[in-house]
C-alpha cells in the first residue's frame, strides 16, 4: 500500500511489531481529530482546539527516566541522578512485553524529522497507541513531504504506550511509569504516563547526545528569534521562565520556542511546533500565543473545559498549574519558515529568581556568561515537574539539566568557543521576583521583561550607563525606556535593605557551592566570575 493510504496492517516489522490491528500511517490532523473524538480521547473546544487530559502525570516524571547503559554510550553519558543507568537485559524483557501489549491494537505512526537543517536533521518514527499523542508528534516535529515519506528511513523510533504499566519488582523501574532511552538500539520506550512532554523531551535528550558527540554542534534548551535587520537572539531558560512568551514578539520573527542547534553556519530549530505553558494566559500581554488556543489543530493539555458549552478556562488550575498548548509553528503569524538563521548577536539567559535578589537585567562578561550557563540558576516553577507545587530555588546546568546526556562542560566549552568567535553579547534576565522573595515580592511584569530585552537587542542598553552589583559582580543598567529605574537595582526595591544583603549573600554562597564541581574543567577566570 502507498504512504498516502490512511491505514494499513503492516509496516512496523523492523520494530518487532508484527500483529497490530490497524496502523494509521502519518495521518493528517483532520483524521486524527476524527479518531480522537471517536475513541473518547478528548473534546473539541468551541473555537476548534482539542482539549485532552493526561491523568495521573501532569508533568514530567523526572525520576522515571533512564538511559540504557550499553557499550556505545557508556563512556560518554554523564551518569548520575539525571541520567540513571538501565540494564540492557531488563530493557529487552520490557520491550518484549510491550510488543505483546500491542498485539491486536490500533496504532498511530508519525514519520517526521527533528532538526530544520537538512544536513543535520534526524529521521524519526513516533509510534503511539493514542491518536492525540500522534497529533502531538505531528504538531511538534518537522513534517515530512509526501516525497520524503516514500523514502523515509527512521534513525530513531519512539514507542509511547500510556496504557502499558511497568512492574517495578520485575522491570527495575521506580514505578509503573518509565521513559527509557536506548542509544545503541536507537529506540525510546515510554509507558505508564500520558504526559505528552515526555515525547518531545526524550527526542531532545538524544539530540543532546548525538549532535555534540558526532558533529560538535551545540544543542541548546532555548528559544530563538530574528529581528528586522537579520540579527538573531537566543533565549536560554527552563520551563516556565518565559522562553516561549518573550521570544514570541510581533516585532521579531520566531525561529523556535524551545530547542535549537548552533553549528558553523548559525542557528536551526529542532522542532516544527511549540509547547507553551498557558496557565492564566493573558490575551493583552501574549496575544500571539493566546490566538493559538483558539485554532483547529492546537492541543490544550489539562486545560479546564465546560463540557456543555465547550468553552475553556485558561485561568483554572484545579487540575494542574502545568497547562499546555501544543501547536505547529505555522499557527504563529511571524515566523522564520525555514527554521534557520545566522549566528546570534545576543544571548539572553532567563532565570526565575525565587529569592528576588537578581536584577531584572544585567550585562555579562564572557566569563560570567559561561559561569551562569553552567550554573543554570532558576526556580522549579510550579507544575512543570510532578510534585512541585511552588517555586523552589535550584541549579539546572545549561538551563536544561534534565535533558543533558553529556558532561555539562561539553556544552559549556562549545558555548564559550562560539561566544568568543562571533563576539556575542550576553545578558542575564530575571523574570522572577522583585521587591522581596517569593511570597513577599511581586513577579516582574512580562511587559517590563519585554521592554528590557528589546532595549538589549536594539543596543539601547549597551549605549547607556551601568552600575556594578556588589554581590554578584553584575553590570546593571541605570535606566531603560518603559521600565521604572528604581526597580533595575533590586536592593532598592526591598523595604529592608539589610535583609536583601543577607539573602543575596546566601544566594552567592549557594552559587559558589554548586559551582565547585565544574572548577576542575574551567579556567580560573570563569571559576572566579562570581
Swiss-Prot record:
Family annotation (Pfam families): PEPCK_ATP
Main location, first listed in the record: cytoplasm
Classification via Gene3D superfamilies: 3.90.228.20, Phosphoenolpyruvate Carboxykinase, domain 1, Phosphoenolpyruvate Carboxykinase, domain 2
GO terms classed as biological process: gluconeogenesis
Binding-site positions, Mn(2+): 201, 221, 258
Top-level enzyme category: lyase
HAMAP family: PEPCK_ATP (MF_00453)
Record-linked PANTHER family: PHOSPHOENOLPYRUVATE CARBOXYKINASE (ATP), PHOSPHOENOLPYRUVATE CARBOXYKINASE ATP
Family of this protein: Belongs to the phosphoenolpyruvate carboxykinase (ATP) family.
Protein name: Phosphoenolpyruvate carboxykinase (ATP)
